[in-house]
UniProtKB/Swiss-Prot annotation:
<protein>
    <recommendedName>
        <fullName>Phospho-N-acetylmuramoyl-pentapeptide-transferase</fullName>
        <ecNumber>2.7.8.13</ecNumber>
    </recommendedName>
</protein>
<keyword id="KW-0812">Transmembrane</keyword>
<keyword id="KW-1003">Cell membrane</keyword>
<keyword id="KW-0131">Cell cycle</keyword>
<keyword id="KW-1133">Transmembrane helix</keyword>
<feature type="transmembrane region" description="Helical">
    <location>
        <begin position="9"/>
        <end position="29"/>
    </location>
</feature>
<feature type="transmembrane region" description="Helical">
    <location>
        <begin position="182"/>
        <end position="202"/>
    </location>
</feature>
<dbReference type="InterPro" id="IPR000715">
    <property type="entry name" value="Glycosyl_transferase_4"/>
</dbReference>
<dbReference type="GO" id="GO:0009252">
    <property type="term" value="P:peptidoglycan biosynthetic process"/>
</dbReference>
<feature type="transmembrane region" description="Helical">
    <location>
        <begin position="257"/>
        <end position="277"/>
    </location>
</feature>
<keyword id="KW-0961">Cell wall biogenesis/degradation</keyword>
<keyword id="KW-0808">Transferase</keyword>
<dbReference type="GO" id="GO:0051301">
    <property type="term" value="P:cell division"/>
</dbReference>
<feature type="transmembrane region" description="Helical">
    <location>
        <begin position="53"/>
        <end position="73"/>
    </location>
</feature>
<keyword id="KW-0460">Magnesium</keyword>
<feature type="transmembrane region" description="Helical">
    <location>
        <begin position="77"/>
        <end position="97"/>
    </location>
</feature>
<comment type="pathway">
    <text>Cell wall biogenesis; peptidoglycan biosynthesis.</text>
</comment>
Amino acid sequence: MVITKGVTALLVSFFVALGGGRVLIPWLLKLKIGQTVRTEGPKRHLKKSGTPTMGGIIFLLSLVVTVVVFQAFDAKTLLLLITTLLFGLLGFLDDYLKVVLRRPLGLRAREKLLGQVIFSLVLTFGAVAFLGRGTDWYIPFSRLLLGEPRYLELGNVFFFAATIFIMVGFANAVNLTDGVDGLCSSVTLIVMSFFAMTSLALKEKGLFIFALALMGGLVGFLVYNRHPAKVFMGDTGSLALGAAVAGFAVLTQTELFLLLVGLIYVVETLSVIIQVIVYQLTGKRVFKMSPLHHHFELSGWSENKIVLVFSLVTLIMVLISGYGL
């Protein structure tokens, strides 16, 4: 019954996103809300200049509609939905400043960081104070290897600090991954399948509906976002997806699994950090360009090949992680 309801939610969300895209994309084109492509990026990206952005609205709308239709109003689901939408709103403001008000850098870095920290606190405090979330992390594979689940106790201070770091870190990591047509949406679609599986195992019906609804919305969005993309998700979508991924982990005590299922996000972020540090110290670059997907682009990989390989890596990590629950 729960699985049937979840699959139905996925289909509803898919069709809402499909219809939403048909309405939103022409409207964005009419308003000339198009992405400005950086000249220092891969040269073949220059032809994408003017492609509508803020497309994250498509799958966020389908998510909200589906959650309401299926009345997934339990406290955990609502807290995750609110946090996801708050991050999406922050991304929307950033996109709006960039493409509508023509402020190239959008929100200032400190403004964006402050908003992310505050919204992360909303989820963290809500989970601990109102949902009875403990300050421990489930240790992956402990049930499989030791016969019983084991947890790593962090204590209040470290738990809050670590959770905020995870929320902010993954919001920005997912944002970094959004640099190739269909990449971020494809990888996150597969990551969400892990959290759907986790929610089902924990009998969290609301979170299960949320995960399937977001998956359906992403499939619908991919119809327009696959190469060659007719729309980009923008920070509106990528920050929201990052918050959803990290928020799911916090609410299901699976934070450590993010290193596995979110491997692509982690590697993309590390490639940027390594590139900056090595260049500042030696004046040389480790990668042709960072994040990592741009390195592969400049190495001759097509966008479709990058999406396929990164998605397969994510799928493998999700399958492995399933045994660790």
